[in-house]
Amino acid sequence: IYPKDGIPYIESPYITDYGILDRMEPVNVKKNHRIQVFAQAADILSKEAENLVPLEASIGGPFTIASNLKGVEYLLRDCRKKPEEVHRLLEIITQTQMSCIEMAAEYGMGIAMADPVANPALIGPKMYEEFVFPYTKQLTDYTVKKTGKKVSLHMCGNTYSIWKYLVQYELNELSLDNIIDLQRAVEKIG
């Protein structure tokens, strides 16, 4: 929903039954109108701003996108009750994001990723290890392979319990929440 004087919001989850995954495929970025509008803008930026400023395409982390499609409370419940279905959804999302990364690479862009729902305060380190780390790792590695650039990542909240995962990502920048002791982050993460 796009209110005239407010921020957009999702009225109800798109995925109410995981049976829809049987018919879902990763988004074809070459045929998706909305993504093609982005591609046109990226083309202009790459020609006009190249070598002036760093260019990055912003993508959502797979877990946050899954929460937008399923609803946060339902996704968190299903991580316990239907983990195999959550993994199926995350795989489709990750494949779509890989296509977006390929497109960004065509324009010499790096990748900035935010995954606010992957906050350990919401999911804890064990769920992070199972449902976030493998997909984010896959995307950060893929970004370096396709773009030659490491990822800028933003993580909300108290992330101390997942630092052992964050250091394994291919990152050029890590944006942490204001509650984090930055001196400690420099010492432990770099």
Task: Spell out what each predicted region is.
Residues M24:
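Acidic/glycine-rich phosphate/pyrophosphate-binding loops and surrounding catalytic core
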Residues I1-I20:
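Alpha/beta catalytic barrel-like cores
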Residues I7-E11, V27-G190:
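Active-site loop segments of alpha/beta catalytic cores
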